[in-house]
Amino acid sequence: MVRRALVSVSDKTGLVPFAKRLAALGVEILSTGGTQRALADAGVPVVSVGDYTQAPEILAGRVKTLHPRVHGGILYRRGLASDEADVKARDIPPIDLVVVNLYPFREAVAAGKPFWDCVEEIDIGGPTMVRSAAKNAAHVGVVVDPADYERVAAELEASRALSDQTRFELMKKAFAHTAAYDAAISEFLTARESTDAQAKRFPATLAAVYSKAGDLRYGENPHQAGAFYRAGREPDEPTVAFAKVLQGKELSYNNLLDLEAALAAVKEHDEVACVVIKHNTPCGVSLGKTPAEAFARARACDPVSAFGGIVALNRPVDAAAAKELTDLFLECVIAPGYDEAARAALGAKKNLRLLEAPRLAEPRTSWTRRPEELRELRSIPGGLLVMDRDLGAIRRDDCKVMTKRAPTDAEWEDLLFAWKVVKHVKSNAIVFAKEKRTVGIGGGQTSRVESVKTAVMKAQLELVGSTVGSDAFFPFKDGVEEIIKAGATAIIQPGGSVRDPEVIEAADAANVAMVATGMRHFRH
């Protein structure tokens, strides 16, 4: 039976109606600070914790509830003779329900408050009460989420007590709540400047907080269950995780993966760009004067694969672009926005998933990334692989000309474009590019020459006069020979093979320009 509740919350959503229902059941409510004032102002009978413990708040509120009369009332095991004797001897009444949520630490960090102001928002008494109540869940209920108020109030109104199952479920939620809170603190401190750059990027203990955004219909395949979890803080750069879904069917596991691949690839470009993704791999990428032109050119690279694909654009979609998009069956489109005419046209495709990420139209240099957003995490059974995200980029001046002939200005433009694309293709990756669009893509092969052959075989556009990007060096000259045979005139690659001299000799013999970036872009 719930006779007494301690209520102290930062998030006061639904607080007063819930407290009134408790009071109507005759539950004595203990409270502190702002929560106590809010309840008293609403006419809810409330007892100050300071009056209850006969120990007023001290240190400007830093110590309020850290008292044996509070924690003894929460933690004592009902029915255990030794515990009953202890609380009776010390006049400690039972506290049967603890309703607490914690100081808004994450909000303070997100608001960019100074370091010590953020530290001041680290709750001490709240987590202690939550953990005490959760540990004693056999006898005490603990509520950390306003979404549970209705359920708890209804159950108490029906039986004056909480069932074992309800207390257990609330216990799980409470420990998850405090764990997430502590992880957020750890993440914040890890992000502080350190003299050890490696320790800052890869701390001894990695704590990350993700909240369940929802269940998915299934995972990668129907026999695999799936769910989507979102980070506690929205990144400054545009992301799929925080993009706004405007219409369409529920996003699937594969949709989310493909959307992220499309978004990552289109974010490489400051010019008007479009990326078409299929099975997490680009099948067409193009720049254009307008979004409509960029999409039409990207689609033309591999129109068969584009069917049922995912499209990312880095400029708002207008009526002309919408017309092009509606001419093809697509799963998803993500863009910075859509004008009224575009929304009307795309709205006719009821199942088409439209996502909006407004900052996608902004220059990449305008996005800031926190240290945790510079990491890429991949799970393996029993462990986690962590590395820096591949944000490596090169300029013309960073490259070294390997051959007798240097690229022309037009070739340079296409080479740098191909280099931005090839890092998003599964290794071994080869991209043929011409006039700032892909004309042939080959990836996922176990030998580089086979990726070249795949790109040539799949090409729907003229390869003569094209340029080629390779995500890693050519281990043999055979790949370059196949590129020359296809009609390409310039190649960009990392360089560094022991057979570079043979590869360069083959390029020179065909008057093909080749440059080395000194940077590899493997993608597994």
Curated annotation (Swiss-Prot):
PROSITE patterns: MGS. Keywords: Hydrolase, Multifunctional enzyme, Purine biosynthesis, Transferase. Pathway: Purine metabolism; IMP biosynthesis via de novo pathway; 5-formamido-1-(5-phospho-D-ribosyl)imidazole-4-carboxamide from 5-amino-1-(5-phospho-D-ribosyl)imidazole-4-carboxamide (10-formyl THF route): step 1/1; Purine metabolism; IMP biosynthesis via de novo pathway; IMP from 5-formamido-1-(5-phospho-D-ribosyl)imidazole-4-carboxamide: step 1/1. GO terms for molecular function: IMP cyclohydrolase activity; phosphoribosylaminoimidazolecarboxamide formyltransferase activity. GO terms for biological process: 'de novo' IMP biosynthetic process. It catalyses: (6R)-10-formyltetrahydrofolate + 5-amino-1-(5-phospho-beta-D-ribosyl)imidazole-4-carboxamide = 5-formamido-1-(5-phospho-D-ribosyl)imidazole-4-carboxamide + (6S)-5,6,7,8-tetrahydrofolate; IMP + H2O = 5-formamido-1-(5-phospho-D-ribosyl)imidazole-4-carboxamide. InterPro entries: AICAR_Tfase_dup_dom_sf, Cytidine_deaminase-like, MGS-like_dom, MGS-like_dom_sf, PurH-like. Residues 1-144 form the MGS-like domain. Its EC number is 2.1.2.3, 3.5.4.10. The keyword S-adenosyl-L-methionine does not apply. Gene3D superfamilies: 3.40.140.20, Methylglyoxal synthase-like domain. GO terms for cellular component: cytosol. The IMP cyclohydrolase activity resides in the N-terminal region. Belongs to the PurH family. This is Bifunctional purine biosynthesis protein PurH. The lineage of its organism: Bacteria, Pseudomonadati, Myxococcota, Myxococcia, Myxococcales.
